[in-house]
């Protein structure tokens, strides 16, 4: 047996429905913005971690050989197998791979005693390039200590 609704109360009003839809829309927008921001920060964290991993491998190479690998003789590929399982790649694909530049070339030995590593980060607040000039499109980097 159905109970009759009290007089004057037939369901939700249009205003109540519109307010509910507006609240849901605002919460959805906040969720989408947070999701995009979290993904961007995660990709940047991976880039910074990759740069640190390459930096560590370069330092191990230098401790074994006394100098850093020359870019013309393979550069970072010299690190694979012995110091790195593989060369890390950018989380968004190979559109902006990591860049290695050997520096401080010795005129007497022909060996490199410095380097710069570059990545392209999405968060403008993380930009840090200790080496200049930096390659076009790259805004984060480090150099040998």
What residue spans do the PLM features occupy?
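Intrinsically disordered, low-complexity repeat segments enriched in small/polar residues
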Residues: 5-6, 145
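Short, surface-exposed interaction loops/tails
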Residues: 108-145
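A generic fold-level signal
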Residues: 9, 46, 109-112
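N-terminal export/targeting and maturation segments
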Residues: 3, 47-48, 63
């Amino acid at each position: 047996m159905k109970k009759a609704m009290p007089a004057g109360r037939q369901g939700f009003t249009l205003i109540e429905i519109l307010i509910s839809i507006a609240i849901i829309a605002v919460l959805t927008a906040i969720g989408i913005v947070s999701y995009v921001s979290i993904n961007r920060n995660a990709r940047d964290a991976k880039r910074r971690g990759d740069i640190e991993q390459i930096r560590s491998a370069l330092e191990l190479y230098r401790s074994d050989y006394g100098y850093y690998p020359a870019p013309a003789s393979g550069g970072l590929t010299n690190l694979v197998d012995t110091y790195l399982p593989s060369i890390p790649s950018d989380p968004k694909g190979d559109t902006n791979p990591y860049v290695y530049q050997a520096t401080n070339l010795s005129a007497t030995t022909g060996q490199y005693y410095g380097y710069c590593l570059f990545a392209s980060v999405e968060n403008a607040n993380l930009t840090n390039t200790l080496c200049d000039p930096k390659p076009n499109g790259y805004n984060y980097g480090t150099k040998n200590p």
